[in-house]
Amino acid sequence: MSELKNDRYLRALLKQPVDCTPVWMMRQAGRYLPEYRATRSVAGDFMSLCKNAELASEVTLQPLRRFPLDAAILFSDILTIPDAMGLGLYFEAGEGPKFERPITCKADVDKIGLPDPEGELQYVMNAVRQIRKDLQGEVPLIGFSGSPWTLATYMVEGGSSKAFTKIKKMMYAEPATLHLLLDKLADSVVEYLNAQIKAGAQSVMVFDTWGGVLTPSDYNEFSLRYMHKIVDGLIRENDGHRVPVTLFTKNGGMWLEQIAATGCDAIGLDWTINIADANRRVGDKVALQGNMDPSILYAQPERIRQEVATILEGYGDEGTGHVFNLGHGIHLDVPPENAGVFVDAVHELSKPYHK
């Protein structure tokens, strides 16, 4: 991977030797950075920022100017696919994303088509191309999508939810309708991620934020089955290089063996699982990403370093196969200097594990 100045992240995902543990942060481009807030105010609103390739690239690169991160992640949103399907995405102040036309029945599912990644979603591909150009080979670029199940929760609920009653009603009363929707979404995600890879994404990640609200059997049937379909459909080699894929189910620690069996390269872990246990269970099959509680970034520097040391020790001295990250996105009111302490601690404290 000679064109990359720093390929630590990709090497760790492929379990190749690295000099120290690579690190990046979910939501590393975001509201905790004053420069992000300034750029967003220029764009006007969140989706305008996503749809402007130059500004999306600017906010993607902002955290890399502050911190020696080992990867950049595309600045976008998981709801781009349902938005492109015509559901009318909008953001209510203080309430998060909502849809004007949620999915309520089979007729609604029949109506939606698969968006063209270089048509309705071309703005995402333009952002990928712009970011790759602006990165100048410094670090790899991660592309991403929401999982079919997680996208479906927003589409059926009409926005965020705490109890997920609407989608669970569909799941138990009209399972065939939900499977039809999930199948369409899986096909869309495959096309979308493959287009990101062709546009320049060097690794991809599927975020299954709400898989953890399901029973074990429902998780297999309504979430994992469709992520497996995505893994099977992805371009796994591009431009002469392997394109690693990471699956992340929040609150999915009980299902690591099943997730590893999809053929993914890595599993993202949240903070509710001990990384030593995870490594014992599936470390021979996949790399692991995670898994510090993002709230620890509110602590004093020494406490942050202590937590980093604990997680590194838990993963052990295999020398590779671990990408350090938070267990979910960084909180918007974390002091940026604390994020810097975290990133520096990972690089410094992991070196003895990579001799």
Swiss-Prot record:
Query: Which InterPro entries does the UniProt record give?
Result: UROD/MetE-like_sf, Uroporphyrinogen_deCO2ase_HemE, Uroporphyrinogen_deCOase
User: Per the UniProt record, which EC number(s) apply here?
Assistant: 4.1.1.37
Q: Does the keyword Cytoplasm apply?
A: yes
Xref: SUPFAM superfamilies: UROD/MetE-like (SSF51726)
Q: Where in the cell is it found?
A: Cytoplasm
Q: So where does substrate get bound?
A: R27, Q28, A29, G30, R31, D77, Y154, T209, H328
Give residue numbers for the site Transition state stabilizer.
D77
The reaction(s) this protein catalyses: uroporphyrinogen III + 4 H(+) = coproporphyrinogen III + 4 CO2
Role description: Catalyzes the decarboxylation of four acetate groups of uroporphyrinogen-III to yield coproporphyrinogen-III.
Subunit structure, per the record?
Homodimer.
Q: Which family does it belong to?
A: Belongs to the uroporphyrinogen decarboxylase family.
Q: Which NCBIfam families match?
A: hemE
Q: What is this protein called?
A: Uroporphyrinogen decarboxylase
Species for this entry:
Photobacterium profundum (strain SS9)
Q: Which gene encodes it?
A: hemE
